[in-house]
Structure formats: structure tokens, C-alpha cells
Amino acid sequence: MVISLNSCLSFICLLLCHWIGTASPLNLEDPNVCSHWESYSVTVQESYPHPFDQIYYTSCTDILNWFKCTRHRVSYRTAYRHGEKTMYRRKSQCCPGFYESGEMCVPHCADKCVHGRCIAPNTCQCEPGWGGTNCSSACDGDHWGPHCTSRCQCKNGALCNPITGACHCAAGFRGWRCEDRCEQGTYGNDCHQRCQCQNGATCDHVTGECRCPPGYTGAFCEDLCPPGKHGPQCEQRCPCQNGGVCHHVTGECSCPSGWMGTVCGQPCPEGRFGKNCSQECQCHNGGTCDAATGQCHCSPGYTGERCQDECPVGTYGVLCAETCQCVNGGKCYHVSGACLCEAGFAGERCEARLCPEGLYGIKCDKRCPCHLENTHSCHPMSGECACKPGWSGLYCNETCSPGFYGEACQQICSCQNGADCDSVTGKCTCAPGFKGIDCSTPCPLGTYGINCSSRCGCKNDAVCSPVDGSCTCKAGWHGVDCSIRCPSGTWGFGCNLTCQCLNGGACNTLDGTCTCAPGWRGEKCELPCQDGTYGLNCAERCDCSHADGCHPTTGHCRCLPGWSGVHCDSVCAEGRWGPNCSLPCYCKNGASCSPDDGICECAPGFRGTTCQRICSPGFYGHRCSQTCPQCVHSSGPCHHITGLCDCLPGFTGALCNEVCPSGRFGKNCAGICTCTNNGTCNPIDRSCQCYPGWIGSDCSQPCPPAHWGPNCIHTCNCHNGAFCSAYDGECKCTPGWTGLYCTQRCPLGFYGKDCALICQCQNGADCDHISGQCTCRTGFMGRHCEQKCPSGTYGYGCRQICDCLNNSTCDHITGTCYCSPGWKGARCDQAGVIIVGNLNSLSRTSTALPADSYQIGAIAGIIILVLVVLFLLALFIIYRHKQKGKESSMPAVTYTPAMRVVNADYTISGTLPHSNGGNANSHYFTNPSYHTLTQCATSPHVNNRDRMTVTKSKNNQLFVNLKNVNPGKRGPVGDCTGTLPADWKHGGYLNELGAFGLDRSYMGKSLKDLGKNSEYNSSNCSLSSSENPYATIKDPPVLIPKSSECGYVEMKSPARRDSPYAEINNSTSANRNVYEVEPTVSVVQGVFSNNGRLSQDPYDLPKNSHIPCHYDLLPVRDSSSSPKQEDSGGSSSNSSSSSE
């Protein structure tokens, strides 16, 4: 890579300016301050090897061609191209989870700590009693304290104080942990309640509920078990039958009378009754007794308490309930009711006469003398007449005597109050005024006449006669139906008394008492009401406030002028004044007039005799005495009444100095804005000022494609399919593109979205910046181009077939044939002879000579051998001469990745003295182009140590330390030239970097400070850029290549710019992936040790370099300014041996 000195200095100035402008105010000692790497791009010129087929000549045994043979080899020349290099710088900011607060970084909690404080990112320290990620959750019932970490010790459902952990016992428990129940006889909260249970019941310690003993129930166990229940909680069913009652505790049955047994299921045996069947029955004539009461149940034909009597005459059967059916004097049997007939009769009921009807006598020859209509029959033997009911007499021709009726007129009538009795049935016919079966009930009030069927017409509580319905009037009434009051001036019964009331007093028609007219009093209403009273009986008191008394009859107040109302307590109504408020006011604009004299009292904002004029401009209020405020956005002076400013549309506030609140517009801010999508509403005319990215009258339309910003006036400049933000025009690049406008491809070694994916291509293959697909270089294949072309193929895509013969090998890149011994030619198809030649040690092309070269004579062999020896000797002398001016210490090229940077860089290997135990730094090179420290004019102090080192001063300046270098081995004093890597601005570990992201191993105040140190005497050191000649290294130390396939390296040397490649001895122990090597420090130091071997790490391959396994390095420049230059001593010897 080649960068000019001016470009380098400009870039340093740019970085310094950037650091000064963006210096972080954060306290770097704050443990919460972190650093991160940010990338930026610079345009650089990089070199790359360009292969070509080189034809050269060498000595051989071909006598026909005068011992000169043509050879082919693939050589590379350095070409240049421009590219972008991604560089990195360190920037300080708050660590993730923290935010800036002054100079400190304080933790940030996404969720606000509701009951606590934020002590770490998204970590809240909660107050006692609170938990959860944001301390918003109260402790559950089992935990207390900060973050609810302490477990509660409360028992039996007690509540735990979330702050102190103290137990609040549930009802029924006590103690520190609520582990004890309430004492016997107490219950409830804090065991303060006294139990009220009775009959030996126990009390529940929580609720106070009574647990009753067997046989009791009720809230307080005060009741016995209900019938049919007994035992604990009255849950057991009584087994007693037939009405037996069980004991409420034991359940033992107490049987009713007539039953016995354990469950009262056995009736008393015959002849026994009573409780427990303990009594003996006393019934006669075959009667049985009731087992419960002992009452006798008589057999048919008997009656009496103990069944000792026969049925009465005319009855028979069970309970003597049957009536005998015997007629004509027949007698019936008291048991069965059978009839025993008298003489002259026969039949089951003695109903049959032995003589024909109407005859009697022994021979039935006599005619009966009875009245036939009133007679049942005459006796067949004696001729005696049997009268029908209601008739009597010897021949049944007489009615019953008054007061009697029925069969033989034996029954006595029950009619009362002069009622008539029917002689046959005894039915009563009541006299007027009575009713009922026996006519003993007088007519109800309001009825009269026969059977009380007529309704009375008397009124006003007059008494109605039950006989004829005539009315007897009460005092004060008269008339047929007592509906007419006594005439005025009369009173009493019959209205025959005269009233004595005066002054219009009314007389009571009942008792003649006077009811005075309003305003009068006295027994005869002869006295007027006293002052202050009025109305009936002068019982009302005048209620007047501003009056000259009240009317004695009506109580109306006589109001004074200016007052009105029922009580004269109201000022004259608005618009009225004077006596009785009878005069109208002439005041205007809402003014009021004095009720006494009618003078106008103007309302606020008006003036004048009748208040007809408004306040003068600039004044308002009562009597126009107040001055208007200074209205800002108003249409004129303030309102003459209220003093409020009349705001223009879009303004509000007392002084119209406030814009309408968001979302409102217009006069008095009454309108509602319709702007959407965060659009700002104009408070005056409602027009919308749209948020960037939106347009339209209400900002509801997004910007058209390819436009952005306010009113979508800007045109998007995004390329390669990038999405353009309508808000700020920011380009969201598609995969494979980056840059402000997505015009730049991903940097070398990166691809995909945001260029975040790392390319995996090897062997200099190109990585597609979009998909990451590898485009292999000539001679390679595979997904990551990790494989060489298979044997027999070469070229791009390995599509070309090798044309090499005679077991020769084919170069997988160019197809050049490498002949087997004894063969030559482009295709190895020509026979040759083997000679010993001094091929350039860097060439990979070997010459194969045919086996028949031994046919040459001994003379030719001797001649060639001598020539070869002379040629080698000449080469050795020339090489020694060229090496005299070179440094004894040569820089080695080392590739050391750090932080997994893909576009690999080159470093100059060396040893860094670690001050204060600091870690080593790593430096990176994208392309083989270098900065070089130029010569220093004066010599430093030296000692006998063969070493050149680069050290850091305490102010982090980079110096070349030469005090330990042997002056006899290192050439001129001015050779303080060292190679700086192209991106020396990068840093390694964070503690080796400055606040602006530059590697302190390289940066200092000025390289001129080198001469100020007491141990240094050099000066005029500056940065320069130069391209150095090739140099060839033979047998370098152990390599750490990315792939074991590469075995050569190239350095520039002044002798031959087209030097072929030298074979390098690889070590299998170093075959590992260089991208996983930890960052190391690489500075300038001596390459060779005393034993002539390299003492530094080998060359590693960059992952995305087009250089196939070699690197260009700028060696230390030769200087002829010192007289000690020719003193090569052992230095030249070491250099020569190492070179060879």
C-alpha cells in the first residue's frame, strides 16, 4: 500500500480535530464507562501481485545451444489499485444498561422502580414489602422485607406484615407466630370475644360458634332437639312410633297411652289402657275400652259411660244411633231395632192394620169417627183417632192451642216478639221490625218492616224506626229524612231554639255555640281581635317585616313604600319602585333602580342617568372604574362588562397571549384539528404542518416513493434498491451495500445485510458483496476456494486440462509443466541431461534433465563443474558486496489478526517492553504498503547488546531505542528507519489506546521529542513513504500460515526485482487458523540472533488478499552518512549466512 506523507499528516490532523470536537465529558474512572470500536472508511492505494510467464536462460549441457537453455517460470510483478479500507477508532460511552447523568453513567431500568431505586441495569432494589422486577408487586402472604426475600413465620393463616414480618393473627389464634388457639371461653380477633354457649356446649375459637352436646341445638345450644331428633347435633332420628316421644339425649321412647314396647309399636292388650297400659277397663254388656283413654265403646243396644244402660225408647243399634221404625204403637228392640206390634197391627214395622181402612172393632164392623183430613188413622181395635201434626181433640178436629204445635200438639213454639207460630211445623212468622228463626233479632240499622226487607231513608245519623221506618232527627236537623239543617238563627232538637251570635258569627245548630267570623272573638263574637293578631278566633299572628300592621280579618300586611310581598320583606321587583312598588323604573341595560326614590344603579359596563351608555374605551366594570388589561392578540379593547380580552382566532388566555392548545384552533379555540400522524395544526386557520414523511390537508398521506422530509420536498438519493426513510431520507441499504446512500459495496471481507457477515473465501478469491459467494482465483475451486485444482486440471474454474507428459506435474494456476528428471520442453516431451545448476532459490520452477546426460564424457562434465563452481563463487562475492551496506537487523513481516478483523493487515514483528504490566498491542495492514521512519541525523548512545527496540515513554510517545545496539554490527548511526503499518492508527487492547481511538504505541506529541531524551541523540525523524527493492530470505523461521499450501514469501531486494520464489520450510506444528490467534504486539526489532536464526513469528496469510502466499516489505534503508558504515564485522557474516 502506498500513502503519501501529506495524506498521512492530513489524516492525523483530521483525527486530532475529531477527538477535540467529540471529547467525551464522561469520567473515565467511572466503572460504568465502556469503550467500543467504531469503523470508518478511507481510500487507499494497494499493491497486488500480477502473475506473468517469464522466460529466462540458464547454463546447461546443451552444446548445440552453446550450453544455454531456455526456461519458463511464473513470476509476479507488483501492480497497484485503489480500494477502501475500513479503519477503527475507540469511543467512550456508557456501558450497556447505563445512561449519562452529568459526568457519570447511572444505571437505567427499562421499567421504573415503583417502590425502590435502580442500582444496576434493569435491576431494582426494592423497599421492604415490595418485590418484582420493577418493585411494583407487593409481597405475597409468605414473604416480607426488601425484594420479599424473607419467609414469614406466621402460622394458622395469619397475615404477615410485608415490611416488618410481624404476624397479624387470624381470628381464633394468639401468640408471636399465632401458633396457639384462644383460651377456653374466648374466641375471635385477638381472642377478645367471650363465648355465650349454654348447656355445657364448647365454643369455636375462631367464629364463636357453639358446639352443642348431645340433645341440644340452637345458636347458643339453648334449645332441646326438635321432635323426632336426638343425640349429637340432633342428627339421629327417633325410632318411636305411634306418637311416642324420644328423649333428646338418649333417644329412649316415652309411649303415649294405649301403646307399649321399646319403640311404642305394640298396642295395649285387651282389657288394658292408659300410659304403659297400666289401667284396667271398666266397660259392661260386652263393651270394649279405648286403649289410650279407657273410654268404653259399647256394643249395639247399650249406652252410658260404662255401657250399663239400654238405648232410649225409639233408638237402637251402635251408640243407639239408629231410629226405630215401628209405627202404630209398636215397640222396637234396643239391640237390633225389631218391632213388637200392639194388638190390631202386624208387619215388620207394625204398619199393617188388621181391619180395613176406616173400620175398627173385633170384627172390624165399626166405622172410625175421626176427621179424615186431620187424622192419620184410627186404632183397629178401639177406634181411637191418631191426629196429624197441628191437630188435637178426640176426633182430630181442633187446632193446637197457641204456643204449641206438632204431633199431638206436644211441641212448644219458640217464636218471640209477637210472632205467629205455625201449628203444624212450628215455623215463626215475625212481626214488623224483627227477623230470625224465632224472631228474636231486631232489624239491623238502616232496615225496617216485615223480615227487615225495607231500607231506611234517614240521614245525618237520624234514628230509623224498625217497624215503620220513620226518622227521629238529631239536634240541628229536621225534615222527613232529617236532611235539612236548622234555619239560620235556630238550633237544637226540632230547631226550636234561637241563636245569640253577633258580628256575623255562626251558631252551632247542635248546641248553639258561636263560631266568630275572622277578626272577632268572645262568647258571642262581640270583641274584635287584639293588635298583632288576625283570622279565626284571632289565633294567627301578623308576620310583616316592613309594614304598618296587618288586616285583622285576612292578615294581609300593609307594606311601607319600597317593599312588597306577602310579608313585606321583599324589595320592589326589578323595574318597580315607590309606594306599594306601583311606579315603573326607566333604567336600561340591566340596571336596577332604588325602590325608595327610583334612582338607577347601573350594571357593570354601563353609565348615565338611565344607564343607557357603555363604558368609555379602555374601561370596564362597576361604574366603569376599572382599567382594561393590555390585550396582546385582541380585536380591540377589553369587554366593557367583564374586562376580558376578545381574542383573535388561534389565541386564548386572559390577555390573549397564549396559542390555542394542541389539537384546537379558531375563535376561542373551539375548533378541533384534524391533523394526523403527528402533524402540527395551525391554531388560526386549522391548516396542518405535516410531520416529515407526510403530506395532505390532514397529513394522512405518506410521501410518494423516492421523496422525504417536510412536505416531501426532498428527493431520495438512495441507490441499489435501498429503502428511503420518508422522515429523514436515511437509506436502509439492501444486502451487500453500505455508505450514506448505499453506493458503496461492502468492504473486502464482508457481505450481506449491513455488511455484518464475514466472508469465508480463501486463496485470494473474490467474495460477492451481496451473497458472500466466492469467485475463485485461477487454479482454485470449492465453496470457499479452499481447494487447488485437481491433478490434471488448471486455470479458471479448473476447466482446462493439463497437457504435460512423462509424469510431469502441472501448475494448477498457469498450467505450466514441471518436468520429471530427464525431461524438458513446454510439455516435458523432450529428453535432456542432468547438470548441477545454481537455480535461484526463490523459483518454484525446476528443470528436469533426461537420464541419458550421463552419456556426456568426463571432460565435458569436468568443464561444466568448474564453470559452475566459478559461477557460484562469483555470485557469493557479489552477494557479499551488496550485503555490506545493509542493516544487521532486518525487519520481518508478520500477519497477526486481532478482534477478528477480516480484511487482514501486515505488521512489523518485534518486542515491546511492557510498561506497568500492560498487555501487548496488535497492528493491522490491509495491503502491502508501509510508512517508514526516516533516518536520524545523530548517533544514539549504544551498549554491547545486539538489539534494537521500540519503547514507549510515560507520555505514550513512540521512540526508537538504540542504546542497546552494538555499533559495530548495525551500520550507520542514522539508520533509525522502522516500518510503520498502514493502519498504525488502530489500537490493540483498550488500555493501550487514547481517548480518541489511536494506538498509543505509535502516537506521541511529536517525533521530534526523540532528541529530547537524555539517552537519545537522534533528530530530524519524520514520516515518509517509500517503495523498497526486493530482498530474498532463505529458510525463514516457523510459519503460522492460514493454509499449509503456501510455502514461499517475497521481499523486495535491490539486486533483482523479478526474483523467483524461494521454497520455505513449513512446520506442521504451526498449521493453525490465524484468525483465532490472540492479539499480539508487533514492533521493529532485530531479526537475527547470535545463532543466525530468525527470532520472530513467521508470515501469516491475510484472509482476503490477492497476494498468493507472499508479502512486500520495506527493509531498513542504507545510509552512507556515517563513517562506521564499512565496519561490517560479524554483522556481515551473519547476514550472509542467513541470506543463503
Curated annotation (Swiss-Prot):
Tissues and organs where the protein is expressed, per its UniProt entry: Expressed in muscle (at protein level).
TM spans (from-to): 858-878
Effect ascribed to mutating residue 699 to S: In CMYO10B; uncertain significance
Modification comment: Phosphorylated on tyrosine residues. Phosphorylation at Tyr-1030 may be important for muscle cell proliferation. Ubiquitinated; mono- and polyubiquitinated forms are detected.
One Pfam assignment: EGF_2
Subcellular locations according to the entry: Cell membrane; Cell projection, Phagocytic cup
Chain intervals for the UniProt region annotation (Necessary for formation of large intracellular vacuoles): 945-1140
Ranges of biased composition (kind: Low complexity): 1128-1140
Residue(s) carrying Phosphotyrosine: 1030
Effect of residue 1030 to D: Enhances cell proliferation
Family stated for the protein in its record: Belongs to the MEGF family.
Name the UniProt record assigns to this protein: Multiple epidermal growth factor-like domains protein 10
